[in-house]
Regions:
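An acidic/histidine-cluster motif and surrounding catalytic segment
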Residues: 1-101, 105-254
C-alpha cells in the first residue's frame, strides 16, 4: 500500500532545482524493516532538491511474500508484486506519469545543467518508458551529447529509477498481470525478475518508445540485496563485515 503521509523533512536540505519536477507521482519501493535504506534514500532525495512537503512523494511498503511460487526467489516475487501494485494504483488514479525508484538508488553527481536539460526535454517529447537510471554507457558514443535522451530497443538489467507515461501504464499493467497467471518459462513471459519482465514487455510491444537518459542519472547502491541473495549475507558476523566494506566503498568511490 502507499503511505498516506509524505516522508519527513530533512533539516538543512539545500535548495536546488528538483530533478523530479513534472511527475504526477514519485514512489520509492522500500521494505519497512529496511530502515537503513530508507535513511539512505532520504539523503539521496534531499541531495537533488526533492521537497519533502510535496504530496507526490510516497514511500511504498514493499511486498514480502511467504512463498516464492514459480519466481526465482521470495525477493524477486515481492519486487514484481510491488511494482505491479504501484502501477495498478497509478492506472486507477489516472496519473499522467509516474516515477518509480527502488530504495538502493543513488543519484549521480552530474552537473545540474545536464539534469535540468534532461528533465525539461523529457516532458516536451514523445515517450512511454524513460530510464533515468540504467547500466548503458554512452562514453564511446560521441553523437550522444550530455543532457539528451536516447531511444533504446535493447535489453538490460535494473529497474531502480524509471518512469512510465500515461498511455503505457494500462498496457504494462495488463502484461504484468498476465505474467502472474502463467507458469514459469512460458514463451510469452512467466514468473521472473521484474527487470526481465520489462524487457519482455518492450520486446513484445515494439511500438513502445523507450528512452535512456544520457548520461544515466542514477545507479544502484552497493548494499545487501533483498532480491539477489548471496551466501555471505546469510552468515552472522561476515554479513556485518560485508556491510562495512560496502559502506566504505560508497564513501570512497560514490
Amino acid at each position: 500500500m502507499l503511505l498516506d503521509s509524505p516522508a519527513p523533512s530533512l533539516a538543512g536540505s539545500p535548495p536546488a532545482r528538483p530533478l523530479l519536477a513534472g511527475f504526477d507521482r514519485i514512489v520509492v519501493v522500500n521494505l519497512p524493516e529496511r530502515t537503513d535504506r530508507r535513511r539512505e534514500m532520504e539523503v539521496e532525495l534531499a541531495k537533488i532538491g526533492v521537497d519533502w512537503t510535496d504530496v507526490r512523494l510516497r514511500f511504498f511498503a514493499a511486498k514480502r511474500p511467504t512463498e516464492k511460487g514459480d519466481w526465482p526467489s521470495l525477493g524477486a516475487r515481492g519486487c514484481f508484486q510491488s511494482h505491479l501494485e504501484i502501477l495498478q494504483q497509478a492506472q486507477a488514479a489516472e496519473l499522467r506519469n509516474i516515477l518509480i525508484l527502488e530504495d538502493d538508488c543513488d543519484f549521480t553527481d552530474h552537473p545540474a545543467a545536464v539534469r535540468a536539460a534532461l528533465l525539461d526535454s523529457l516532458h516536451t517529447t514523445d515517450w512511454d518508458l524513460a530510464y533515468l537510471g540504467h547500466p548503458v554507457s554512452f562514453d564511446d558514443t560521441p553523437t550522444v551529447e550530455p543532457g539528451t535522451w536516447v531511444a533504446h530497443a535493447g535489453s538490460f538489467q535494473q529497474s531502480h529509477c524509471y518512469a512510465v507515461n500515461r498511455r503505457a501504464i494500462p498496457r504494462l499493467v495488463e502484461f504484468l498481470e498476465a505474467i502472474t497467471r502463467r507458469p514459469e518459462g512460458h514463451p510469452l513471459g512467466g514468473p521472473q525478475h521484474y527487470d526481465g519482465a520489462l524487457n519482455m514487455f518492450r520486446q513484445q510491444n515494439p511500438d513502445v518508445k523507450t528512452l535512456l537518459a544520457g548520461p544515466s542519472l542514477a545507479h544502484q547502491r552497493s548494499s545487501k540485496s533483498d532480491i539477489y541473495e548471496h551466501w555471505y549475507d546469510k552468515i552472522p558476523g561476515l554479513s556485518q563485515l560485508v556491510a562495512l566494506r560496502r559502506a566504505l566503498k560508497k564513501r570512497l568511490f560514490g
